[in-house]
């Protein structure tokens, strides 16, 4: 009988979901094993080495506010940072960091190795140990090792049945240079899980020494660096590197159109769906045929790495055509290609088979997170990873699971979409996916998530003290701004009236001034009316709370109204086929996905408001009949 080691939680896969899951479980006191195919590729960024961007930055901030790691990693290893959408409202402000991929992987590996309760091990999991009551009991590896655990988290990324394509040539691989994981897909199918195929891709890398930078448009980082983490201990001031911008040409487009038949998608070699919001260059040329040019960003992969990432230029063209294609771009006429672009096709588990806790519906104690659930992006993976890690630990410890409501965070929006929508293409989080984005801003992620992180046990005393001090300073500044007044005839009052093209009648509070269009806290500071002792985040927090107070209150009222109705639980044994007043499609969808609440039911594709109304009426009729029976029995 082979020796079997025992743990509380086992995490399979050490990408961005696996790292967050393992750290969360270990920090919550569980003996945790993190199994990976390659100990030298932990926390690797195989595509664009970057963190953040629209909606993704909100996820990174939220993970950090809960006690996770991705934001700290970006703050420690960035090459460049920029705030996107800075000229628009705070709901869509987005911090983005270009990171050093080797440094990022080295730092996260060090964090994992130094984490108490966590052990790392190299191995390929091929089978799950399942108990008599459909509960997970552990895993076995390709070479026959067994590990027991009460909870297992699958975070296998693109490695299940992974196959990479360059033109019409393919090979089994989870990503370039790393073999695919075999056996686990068949295990999941045997257990009754539905699996399907998705694809993604990554562009070529070119030698930075072969590029003519004089023909590129520099894209410098912001002079004032912003941070993903709310913990100043993670902040590292460092020199920033520029990125660059070029554009496709008519020659680029012609070369692609002439050779579309040689790509794996247009040549018919694969039919898996790729990411809608990160299309290949050939998809762009086909879908936007009237567009004469597309922006292409040239981004460094590291301080000591000669490779440049060609963002927006992923392709499935054969390798011998890729260099010619790259050399049609201004500035890259003499470039040297170091790695070809490729597409990767892989197995995934549609996440409608998961509860909102990310535990699977079929097997108790089995959790699924990250790209395996059909998402794309490191931030989406990290968000799911920390949720799975938290809930796996709570499952092992006999505590109630944590469900993140969609109105409370982008994490909640992401997971609710995954668990209720029949998604058949890689899912990317977007600000437009949230109905409550004015409330779910990056700047207040700590206000929304850190109290929960503290309650769960991931926020220590030092972090909690930092949080309380920050909130107290914001509240005090709001009070000052609503009380301090500027008089009409004061020199500063006259200067502000001239600047804003609006008179001050008698006097106005600083809060009144902040409510004026295009007048901000930085303008108060210019007139000597700010508080120089406050941090930027505290100044912005006070300004946003005042400037957008009416909008925030209205949206919060909408949330409160929706929550009252949407959180109404649905019976787990509800027979949807009996609700004949509902359309057949809606009955079938509800029976298939088994939503836990009325809110979840309303967001399932194929279920419309009339169906929800019919469901409500049916529930009320059933409740009334039950009440009448109970009353009759009492009599």
From Swiss-Prot:
Positions with a binding annotation for FAD: 13-18
A GO MF term: flavin adenine dinucleotide binding
Pfam family of the protein (one): SAM_GIDA_C
CC cofactor: FAD
Keyword NAD carried by entry: yes
Subunit note: Homodimer. Heterotetramer of two MnmE and two MnmG subunits.
Name the UniProt record assigns to this protein: tRNA uridine 5-carboxymethylaminomethyl modification enzyme MnmG
Protein species of origin: Synechococcus elongatus (strain ATCC 33912 / PCC 7942 / FACHB-805)
């Amino acid at each position: 009988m082979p020796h079997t080691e025992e743990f509380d939680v086992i995490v399979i896969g050490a990408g961005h979901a696996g790292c967050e899951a393992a750290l969360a479980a270990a920090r919550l006191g569980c003996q945790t094993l993190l199994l990976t195919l390659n100990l030298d590729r932990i926390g690797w960024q195989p595509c664009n080495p970057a963190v953040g961007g629209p909606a993704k930055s909100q996820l990174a901030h939220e993970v950090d506010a809960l006690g996770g790691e991705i934001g700290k990693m970006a703050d420690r290893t960035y090459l460049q940072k920029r705030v996107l959408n800075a000229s628009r409202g705070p709901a869509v402000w987005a911090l983005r960091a270009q990171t050093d991929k080797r440094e990022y992987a080295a730092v996260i590996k060090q964090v994992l190795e130094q984490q108490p309760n966590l052990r790392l091990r190299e191995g390929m999991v091929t089978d799950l140990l399942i108990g008599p009551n459909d509960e997970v009991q552990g895993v076995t590896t390709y070479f026959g090792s067994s590990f027991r655990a009460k909870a297992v988290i699958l975070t296998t990324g693109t490695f299940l049945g992974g196959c990479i394509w360059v033109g019409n040539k393919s090979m089994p691989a989870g990503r370039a240079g790393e073999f695919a994981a075999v056996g686990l897909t068949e295990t999941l199918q045997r257990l009754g899980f539905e699996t399907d195929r998705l694809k993604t891709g990554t562009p070529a890398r070119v030698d930075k020494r072969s590029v003519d930078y004089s023909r590129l448009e520099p894209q410098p980082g912001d002079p004032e660096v912003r941070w993903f983490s709310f913990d100043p201990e993670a902040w590292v001031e460092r020199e920033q590197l520029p990125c660059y911008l070029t554009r496709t040409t008519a020659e680029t487009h012609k070369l692609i159109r002439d050779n579309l038949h040689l790509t794996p998608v247009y040549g018919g070699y694969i039919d898996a769906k790729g990411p809608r919001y990160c299309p290949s260059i050939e998809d762009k040329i086909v879908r936007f045929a009237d567009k004469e040019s597309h922006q292409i960003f040239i981004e460094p992969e590291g301080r000591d790495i000669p490779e440049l990432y060609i963002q927006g230029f992923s392709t499935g063209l054969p390798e011998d055509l890729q260099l010619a294609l790259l050399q049609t771009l201004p500035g890259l006429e003499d470039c040297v290609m170091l790695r070809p672009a490729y597409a990767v096709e892989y197995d995934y588990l549609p996440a409608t088979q998961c509860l909102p806790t990310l535990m699977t519906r079929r097997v108790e104690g089995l959790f699924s997170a990250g790209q395996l659930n059909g998402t794309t992006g490191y931030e989406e993976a990290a968000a799911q990873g920390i949720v799975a890690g938290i809930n796996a630990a709570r499952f092992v410890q006999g505590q109630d699971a944590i469900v993140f409501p969609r109105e409370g965070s982008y994490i909640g929006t992401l997971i609710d979409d995954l668990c209720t929508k029949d998604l058949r293409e890689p899912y990317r989080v977007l600000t437009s996916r949230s109905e409550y984005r004015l409330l779910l801003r990056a700047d207040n992620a700590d206000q929304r998530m850190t109290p929960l992180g503290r309650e769960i046990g991931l926020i220590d005393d030092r972090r909690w003290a930092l949080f309380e001090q920050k909130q107290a300073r914001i509240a005090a500044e709001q009070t000052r701004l609503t009380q301090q007044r500027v008089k009409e005839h004061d020199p500063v009052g006259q200067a502000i009236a001239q600047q804003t093209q609006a008179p001050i009648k008698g006097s106005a509070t600083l809060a009144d001034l902040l409510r004026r269009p295009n007048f901000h806290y930085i303008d108060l500071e210019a007139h000597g009316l700010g508080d120089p002792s406050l941090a930027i985040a505290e100044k912005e927090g006070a300004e946003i709370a005042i400037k957008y107070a009416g909008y925030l209150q209205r949206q919060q009222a909408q949330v409160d109204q929706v929550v009252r109705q949407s959180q109404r639980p649905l019976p787990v044994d509800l027979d949807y086929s009996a609700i004949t007043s509902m359309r057949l499609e809606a009955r079938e969808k509800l029976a298939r996905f088994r939503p836990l609440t009325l809110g979840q039911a309303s967001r399932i594709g194929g279920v419309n408001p009339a169906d929800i109304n019919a469901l409500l009426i049916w529930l009320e009729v059933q409740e009334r009949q039950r009440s009448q029976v109970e009353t009759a029995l009492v009599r």
